[in-house]
């Protein structure tokens, strides 16, 4: 879909419709989008305009009604293929290896400590045998990520002993566990106070600069949007403008 080597991911003419009591409800109405390698891209707009739906499709958590996705990540196996049309196993493999996710309400498992939560993506990506064989190295990586996000001293705590900001830091560390190309963030500061939210802004900027990881951030937070390399505004299922 793109001849530009700076483009990592592209969506072309994405449509998404839901059936509600027998009526077709359009949410996305032909979205075109290119995501560049290593950029922070924010997507803003009112509730219900299709931001989270688009994020779920880009993250291969949902499928479009029509349209395609092209991805030029580290694995050439998927180059030139419509990754929206992959079977469930290939989608899962690509998603777990190349994408990370951060949500508004953290989604940390309460029965695991912070370190174990961060290790989860590595467990999912590997067989039990492979995980056990590499557990020491993977644990070192998880600990290093917790150090980077500033909560290494909380590694043995259960999530319910963390503040909201600390839980989101743990979720960000978890999203980076498999060294993803892209992290998709759905309202990452929406459940935080202003000061804590600003610290999360700074952390995303820092991680992007240090690791080169790309971030796609759906947000109502104009402060977070202003820190992005680009901001796109959605209205009625389409992008309205581009700010570079």
Model regions and ranges:
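H-loop (His-switch) and adjacent beta-strand-loop-beta switch element
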Residues: 231-243
């Amino acid at each position: 879909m793109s001849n530009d080597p700076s483009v990592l991911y592209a969506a072309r003419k994405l449509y998404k419709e839901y059936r509600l009591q027998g009526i077709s409800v359009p949410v996305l109405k032909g979205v075109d989008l290119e995501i560049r390698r290593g950029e922070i891209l924010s997507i803003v707009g009112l509730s219900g305009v299709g931001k989270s739906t688009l994020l779920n499709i880009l993250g291969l958590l949902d499928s479009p009604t029509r349209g395609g996705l092209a991805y030029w990540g580290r694995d050439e196996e998927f180059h030139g293929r419509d990754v929206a049309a992959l079977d469930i196993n290939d989608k899962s493999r690509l998603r777990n290896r190349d994408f990370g996710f951060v949500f508004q309400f953290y989604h940390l498992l309460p029965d695991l400590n912070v370190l174990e939560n961060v290790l989860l993506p590595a467990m999912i990506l590997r067989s039990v045998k492979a995980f056990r064989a590499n557990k020491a190295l993977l644990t070192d990586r998880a600990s290093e990520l917790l150090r980077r996000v500033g909560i290494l001293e909380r590694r043995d705590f259960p999530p319910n002993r963390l503040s909201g900001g600390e839980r989101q830091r743990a979720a960000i560390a978890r999203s980076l566990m498999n060294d993803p190309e892209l992290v998709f963030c759905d309202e990452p500061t929406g459940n935080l106070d202003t000061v804590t939210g600003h610290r999360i802004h700074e952390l995303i900027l820092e991680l992007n600069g240090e690791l080169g990881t790309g971030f796609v951030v759906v947000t109502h937070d104009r402060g977070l949007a202003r820190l992005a390399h680009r901001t796109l505004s959605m209205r009625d299922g389409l992008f309205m403008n581009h700010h570079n």
